[in-house]
C-alpha cells in the first residue's frame, strides 16, 4: 500500500485493520509503504507532483509511492502471499514481479473510480466512470483470482463491469472504541435524532445528499 502511517483515508484504515487481524490470527505481516522504515515496513519514497496534482491527491488523504523494484523484490522474497490494496504505480510494478516469480497474490478494491472522477468534477459522468472501471479491470484486477470487496455494492459494481475474479465481501469493520454504548440522552436532546456522517469531506461521499435529506425530514 502506498500510505500506511496516517489513517486519514478509508484504504489506509482498512489496510491497518486487515494487517492487525492477520497478526491476531498468528500471521506475520509486513508492508511496503511511504514513510519511516520500521520492523514491519519496507519504506519507499513518496512521489512528488506539480502543485495542482499534488493537491488533488492529498485532498483525498493519500500519498503515492515511487515504485522501487529492489525494495519490492526484497519484500516479495520474504512473503508467502502478497496482497495489493490499490492499482497504483507501486501496485502495478509489484504485480508484474509476483506474476513473474509465481508468488501467490490477492487484491482489494478500495479505490473506486468515483474517488478520482468526483475530484476532477466528472463524477456524474457514467462514461468516464465506466472507462476507469474498465482500465482498472484490464490492466490490474483481472490478473487476480481473488478480490476483497468492502461492501456488496462494490462487488456488484465489479460484476457489472466484467471483473472475473472471485469476489469476497468483507466489511472494513468498526474500531472497538466506536461500538455503541447505550446511555440516556441529555435533556436538551430528548425527542431528537442524532445523524452522524462518517467519511472524508469529498464529493463522492455525497454529504450534500445527507444535508438535503435532513432538510426534508420530519
Task: Annotate each predicted stretch with a short phrase.
Residues 142-151, 168:
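A short beta-strand/loop micro-motif in the catalytic core of glycosyltransferases
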Residues 174-191:
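Acidic anion/phosphate-binding donor-loop and adjacent secondary structure
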Residues 100, 112, 128-146, 161:
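Membrane-proximal helix-turn-helix segments that form the acceptor-binding/catalytic region
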Amino acid at each position: 500500500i502506498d500510505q500506511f502511517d496516517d489513517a486519514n483515508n478509508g484504504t489506509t484504515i482498512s489496510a491497518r485493520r486487515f494487517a492487525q487481524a492477520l497478526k491476531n490470527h498468528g500471521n506475520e505481516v509486513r508492508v511496503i509503504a511511504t514513510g519511516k522504515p520500521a520492523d514491519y515496513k519496507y519504506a519507499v519514497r513518496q512521489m512528488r507532483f506539480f502543485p495542482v496534482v499534488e493537491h488533488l491527491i492529498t485532498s483525498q488523504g493519500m500519498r503515492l509511492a515511487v515504485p522501487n523494484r529492489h525494495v519490492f523484490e526484497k519484500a516479495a522474497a520474504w512473503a508467502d502471499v502478497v496482497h495489493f490494496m490499490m492499482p497504483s504505480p507501486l501496485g502495478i510494478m509489484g504485480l508484474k514481479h509476483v506474476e513473474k516469480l509465481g508468488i501467490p497474490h490477492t487484491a482489494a478494491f478500495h479505490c473506486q473510480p468515483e474517488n478520482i472522477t468526483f475530484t476532477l468534477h466528472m463524477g456524474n459522468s457514467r462514461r468516464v466512470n465506466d472507462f476507469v472501471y474498465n482500465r482498472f479491470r484490464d490492466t490490474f484486477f483481472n490478473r487476480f483470482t481473488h478480490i476483497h470487496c468492502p461492501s456488496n455494492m462494490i462487488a456488484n459494481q465489479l460484476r457489472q463491469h466484467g471483473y472475473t475474479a472471485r469476489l469476497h465481501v468483507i466489511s472494513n469493520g468498526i474500531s472497538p472504541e466506536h461500538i455503541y454504548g447505550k446511555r440516556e440522552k441529555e435533556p436538551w436532546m430528548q425527542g431528537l435524532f442524532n445523524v452522524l456522517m462518517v467519511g472524508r469531506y469529498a464529493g463522492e461521499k455525497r454529504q450534500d445528499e445527507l444535508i438535503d435529506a435532513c432538510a426534508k425530514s420530519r
